[in-house]
Amino acid sequence: MVALTAVVLAAVLAGVGWLVWTNGGAEHWRELTDDRFVYGVPWGTLLAVALVTAFYLFAQRGLWSWYDPLTLPFVSWSWFYPVGVLTSGFAHGSAGHIVSNMTGALAFGVVAEYAWGHYPQRRGHTIRDSLLAPQESRFSSPGARILLVTAAMFAVALLTGIFSLGPGLGFSGAVFGIAGFAIVTKPRAAIAAVVASSALSTLYQALADPVVRGTVSVGSPSPPTWANIAFQAHMLGFVVGAMAGIALLWARRDELASVTVFFATL
């Protein structure tokens, strides 16, 4: 079932992508990203998603047990358990958990990385250089700026793993950080990212679990589903991302579209 779901989902996404790409999408994407991404690809976001997915597949044994990964060693049980504190921001509790976080990371990550850019901006202009060309600053080359995107995402994940209250698990703190950065710097594009992320998650759920059955069970009351959500980690990630976005706008002397940001946050 897992293989069939993955094949169908990949086929649907490939078909939609091919349709858009061959009907003017390629030219529009090149025009949009020519001075923002190296070869038009958000490398930093893709690298982060690939590494987190690899952690789920190999460290958590998700490749062998997709729906029932290894989780207990990676939970941030306590500050006296450093392994959990360091890994909780990258581990996930289920297939749906990682799919949801990775689709969100991809959708918002593209927007955030576009706002950051692989090429430095000075006085409203983009300075384009080759990927590994010598730079006046070690952080101004495209290669370094790409790695900074991945490093920033991982830093927020680690931060939320350290300061979240109670046992935690998941990359969602970093996803909310990426979203906060994207909403502040590119609010309209962030709204489109919400739609894209929701559409991908809905498509995956429809393929993975097309039939939903409701049952009535007899027993003692149980906590609601939202009781297991680390709201404080989400909020911390969002605030850190938003502050980073404000700092970037201030450094570039760009204006903050406060009204648009307000409605994008809603």
What are the language-model segments listed below?
Residues 2-266:
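A detector for small-residue-rich transmembrane helices and their helix-helix packing motifs
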